[in-house]
Each structure stands twice: as structure tokens, then as C-alpha cells.
Amino acid sequence: MFSLEAWIGLRYLRAKKRNGFMSFITMVSIAGIALGVTALIVVLSVMNGFQKEIRGQLLNVAPHAEIGYIDNTDTDWRNLLRFTENRKGILAAAPYVSNQALLANAGEIRGVQIRGILPSEERKVVEYGDKMPAGKFEDLIPGEFDIILGVGLAEALGAEVGNKVTVITPEGNVTPAGVVPRLKQFTVVGLVKTGVYEVDNSLAMTHIQDARVLYRLDKEVAGLRLKLADPQNAPALTAKLIPEAQRDTVWVRDWTFSNRSYFEAVELEKRMMFIILTLIIAVAAFNLVSSLVMAVTEKQADIAILRTLGLSPGGVMKIFMVQGAFSGFFGTLAGVVCGVLLGWNVGRVVAFFENLLGVHLINSQVYFIDYLPSDVDMGDVALIACISLGLSFVATLYPSRRASKTQPAEALRYE
């Protein structure tokens, strides 16, 4: 059963207003709250989806964890395996060397990170080896100086399978004429497509033995790339991987460390968007204050009569708090329903407008993906609803308190 104050407050909310403008302001405030809640849910859902998709893309092309010697005193990469063997959660490990270089072909030059790999082991730690547009990892034959390029890099260089490209390394050769760059011809034997624009435009792989020759290494490796059963558990697993006594000679890092700056930037953007869009709800709550103040002014005679019948100032305050709170509740409810429905279907909505207008809004060269992902988090929805209801409740305090201070004699003097 509703209390008297709640019953009167709901009756005031449903009653036809004598002042049409006041009714309009009330509807605007409810619509404003609904719009703010909808926008906040949709934006956070898109950012959640974007973060989830990019995390999935990165985990397909990047190692889940890496391990290596700090000073490279031990040149046998198999000795590193003792840290990973019989470890629950580690599925595979592959050695690698890595260094910077320039690739040149047909007058085009691009900066790249050349990775020396062991084909039989590399296939075990990355997903894209089975979906190469041309060639395969096993085409990298030691001593042949073969190279596999990302599709974007190959396109930028104008290189195709079978072409030779020139690799220019940072280390130079000392000649009587001075120091000149070291040049080496490599044959393109394959193309790889990871789906991540940045990787596809900078990735170059060769056999680990050829990479050692190119960079004048002995038997050193940069480290091991690891594939984990549960990448989300990478920080906890890597923290226990190296014994305390050997942490000054062996380093280990996981994918969250390697991509920390990116994910921190996305998380910061999410927080800032949350704050900015919450202001929309706050502005709508201020409209709720205006509508309640006007309602208090219109109901002065009613308030005075209720007071003379024995209703306490606190009871009067509750009436208008109920009226305002239910306005906020209806706005929040409408916003949650619209936000969740739109959040679930925002990809289809964007695709519809792209087809209708003949434009492509999501550029994969900028955003890694060419569609708008969405992941509605019910925890975010609950938080947004609570904030909206809280702001709506706060908005009722001043008008309700003002109504409670109404003096019956003053209010009825001119009635």
C-alpha cells in the first residue's frame, strides 16, 4: 500500500496541468534523462565492444607473454624452456630475434621490425600462420634469405611473391670511403594478413638463422614468445614464472604490459566519455528542478489545505519528492530500455546508414576494424541507472524543501 504522501505525489504527476508550459518542462526533463541514459549506455557499450575486439585482434597476432635473458650470456634458447616446461597454462613457446631495418623496393622505402623466427615453432604460438594469402611459414629456408611481408607493407613497397627486396640494417660496413649501410637482398616468399592495420604494414619475418647472419649475431635469441591457455590470466602466470633468485638474469613480460599504453588510453577515454555524458543527465535533472519549483508554485493552495488538515512539513516534502523521483524513474527506465536495445543493435543501425548514405564510417586503417562493435555490460547499465536515479533524487530536494516551508495563512490569503 502506498502512503498518503506517495498517493498524492503520483496523483500530481498524472493530473492534467493547468499550466501547459509546466507540463512541457516536465516532459522535457523526463526525455532529457532518458536521452542521457541512452547515450551513456550506447557509448560505453561501443567502447566496451571496441576494447574487446581489439584485445582479441591483438591476442591473435601478439605473443601472450615473452621471456628472455637480460644480458644474453646464455645463447641456447632451449635453456629458456626450463622455465616454461611442465607449466600449467603454457601451450607453446617459440624463439625469435628482432631488430629494426629499412626495406626498399621499386623506389619505395619503409621502416620495419624484422623478426627472425623458427617456422615450425612460430606456427604454434600465432593464429595467422594458417590463413596466409600467399606462401607459408615453412617457405622460409635457412640460408636462402627469404622473407614474408605483411600485406599492407608489401602493397606499399609494390612487392609480390617472387620479387626481391633490399634490406638495409642500422649497422654499417666500414670501408675506405667511410661507413656505408649494410644491404642484403631477400626474396619475398609469402604474405601474411593479421587483420591489424599497424602489424600488416610493418611486419617482416625471415628465418632465425638468416636474421642472425643479417645482424651479425652468434646464437643469441631475443627471447621466447609464449602462447597461453588463458591470455586473461597472463599477469598472474608470468608473475610466478621466474624464481626469485633468477629475476636479475631473466626478464618476462605479458601482453598487458606490451600494450599497456593503448589499453590505458582506451580506458581513459571511456572514463572521460562517462563523465561528459553524465552531464547530460545532470542538465536534465536541473530541468526537473525547474518543473518541480513550478509545481510547488501552482499547488500553493493545495499545500496550505493539506497543512491545515494536519499534514506535517515533512509529509509535504515527501509529496514532491515522490513526484520528482517518479519523473526520474520513468526517464531512467525509458533510457535503460532504449539504451540496451540500441546497444545490442548499434552495429546494424550504423551499417544501415552506411548503405543508405553510401559512405563508410569506420576506417580499418585507423580503428583496426571496419565495423562498429558493441558489448552491453549489465554492470555499466546498473551503474548508469543508479547515477540517474541518484541525480533525480537530489534534484527533488530543493523544491520539496521549499514546499515544506509554505505557510498556510500566507498561501490562502488571496484564494
UniProtKB/Swiss-Prot annotation:
UniProt keyword list: Cell inner membrane, Cell membrane, Membrane, Transmembrane, Transmembrane helix, Transport
Pfam families, per database record: FtsX, MacB_PCD
Residue ranges the record marks as coiled coil: none
Membrane is among the record's keywords: yes
UniProt key word Transmembrane: yes
Membrane topology designation: Multi-pass membrane protein
Role of this protein: Part of an ATP-dependent transport system responsible for the release of lipoproteins targeted to the outer membrane from the inner membrane. Such a release is dependent of the sorting-signal (absence of an Asp at position 2 of the mature lipoprotein) and of LolA.
Entry-linked PANTHER family: LIPOPROTEIN-RELEASING SYSTEM TRANSMEMBRANE PROTEIN LOLE
UniProt-recorded name of the protein: Lipoprotein-releasing system transmembrane protein LolC
